[in-house]
Amino acid sequence: MVSIRPDEISSIIRQQIESYDQQVQVSNVGTVLQVGDGTARIYGLQQAMAQELLEFEDGTIGIALNLEEDNVGAVLMGSGYGIQEGSTVKATGRIAQVPVGEALVSRIVDALGRPIDGKGPINTNETRLLESPAPGIVARKSVCEPMQTGITAIDAMIPVGRGQRELIIGDRKTGKTAIAIDTIINQKGEDVICVYVAIGQKASTVAQVVDTLTEKGAMDYTVVVSASANDPATLQYLAPYTGATIAEYFMYKGKATLVIYDDLSKQAQAYRQISLLMRRPPGREAYPGDVFYLHSRLLERAAKLNDQLGGGSMTALPIIETQAGDVSAYIPTNVISITDGQIFLSSDLFNAGFRPAINAGISVSRVGSAAQTKAMKQVAGKLKLELAQFAELEAFSQFASDLDAATQAQLARGQRLREVLKQPQNSPLAVWEQVAIVYAGLNGYLDDIPPAQVTTFTQGLRDYLRNSKPKFPEIVGNEKKLTDEAESLLKEAIGEFKQGFTA
């Protein structure tokens, strides 16, 4: 009979206990109570954080937006068709991040930074938080460098500086996107990284924009972020933050960046949809109470950094669509108050054939004048005033039959200045070209040229300067100001070209 030794048994048990090593996985899990319309209500998830990423059973990712006493409200970043009532949801412990880096340049990505251009994966290991804090007061510096748009009317009267936020506002089909695209095209050779964010647009429209940028060689320094109209509202709401995050990476590397949000009205509508589905109380125009913060925290990320942080900049050109020119609606007034000025596009001017259809009277740049090139400042100082006076006189002259010679001269000058500022799409001008034509218009050199021929004259003058007076573009390009020598060359060129033009 085998004798049982208690000490041997106890040592075996002790060994077994010591060698027992089971990995315990603790996860924050919840259950779907209700799902539909791109939102889900989840029971559990006691430790969920605001804006935390949640993973559903079918692989769909959501974001925790409402943290309530007994449930969590989440928005889905997918269709959610595979999610059922009672299915499990896991908290990931991560806040939304997007990939960033040089590899994104010349690519088209969705609101989560995933490539959608069919050119394979994006090779980058770096990510940034989707919602990063904006640079503080000490980190910033005054706007001091120009961001040339290549559009004479803007660069002369409503100049934009690097690090500025300039709103482009107007009715549908007034050329808002055209101004933004021209600005991107004009950054060629300027070492500026551009990010174009398309929010809630037709996929065909985005494809057209990409074609234009590719044709002009602008995709080499541009990232396109697209959340089209058939994407979930969550992605349309997140897309602008993705664009800002991608640009922020380059800004902190000391580069100049330009971000275009086309357009923030659709982002606000997507956010309104999400908020109403999450049963948040509606406010004015049914928008939630924090819709101002939605845009202010986005646009505050645009800045000109100080030299200690590398002197990089992020210039924001948000676009807002108005209804029948109503700039006093909720979202337009919000964004006007956040930005550093606005470029107002008028459908009346557009239909009358004045393109870009910029209404100089109510367009303003609050900080750009500090960044305007000296040459343009010297030349275009009186331009806005002249055009404003002309607009007033034009309205008055419709009722007056006999006008004195001075008024007639001012009306004639105004008509020609308006013609000078007309510009075809996708053909931005260099600073010296803008300086030359504005100088000719303001100093009366075009007064005896019929308005219908002003465009032909200015085009010819630019070609004449380029070929016969190459020193003029060189001086203005290098010195950034209109020196006496440059001015005499310009006067000479205008005189010589005019003789041949009128002969």
Curated annotation (Swiss-Prot):
Keyword list, A-Z: ATP synthesis, ATP-binding, CF(1), Hydrogen ion transport, Ion transport, Membrane, Nucleotide-binding, Thylakoid, Translocase, Transport
EC number: 7.1.2.2
Binding site for ATP: G170, D171, R172, K173, T174, G175, K176, T177
Compartmental location: Cellular thylakoid membrane
Signal peptide: none
Pfam families registered for this protein in UniProt: ATP-synt_ab, ATP-synt_ab_C, ATP-synt_ab_N
GO CC entries: plasma membrane-derived thylakoid membrane; proton-transporting ATP synthase complex
An MF annotation (GO) of this entry: ADP binding
CDD domains: ATP-synt_F1_alpha_C (cd18113), ATP-synt_F1_alpha_N (cd18116), F1-ATPase_alpha_CD (cd01132)
Domain of life: Bacteria
InterPro entries assigned to the protein according to its UniProt record, in alphabetical order: ATP_synth_asu-like_sf (IPR023366), ATP_synth_asu_C (IPR000793), ATP_synth_asu_C_sf (IPR038376), ATP_synth_F1_a_nt-bd_dom (IPR033732), ATP_synth_F1_asu (IPR005294), ATPase_a/bsu_AS (IPR020003), ATPase_F1/V1/A1_a/bsu_N (IPR004100), ATPase_F1/V1/A1_a/bsu_N_sf (IPR036121)
TM segment ranges: none
Membrane topology: Peripheral membrane protein
Catalytic activity: ATP + H2O + 4 H(+)(in) = ADP + phosphate + 5 H(+)(out)
Site location (Required for activity): S363
Subunit structure comment from the entry: F-type ATPases have 2 components, CF(1) - the catalytic core - and CF(0) - the membrane proton channel. CF(1) has five subunits: alpha(3), beta(3), gamma(1), delta(1), epsilon(1). CF(0) has four main subunits: a, b, b' and c.
HAMAP family associated with the record: ATP_synth_alpha_bact
Family, as annotated: Belongs to the ATPase alpha/beta chains family.
Function: Produces ATP from ADP in the presence of a proton gradient across the membrane. The alpha chain is a regulatory subunit.
NCBIfam families in UniProt: atpA, PRK13343.1
Entry protein name: ATP synthase subunit alpha
Species the sequence originates in: Gloeothece citriformis (strain PCC 7424)
Organism placement in taxonomy: Bacteria, Bacillati, Cyanobacteriota, Cyanophyceae, Oscillatoriophycideae
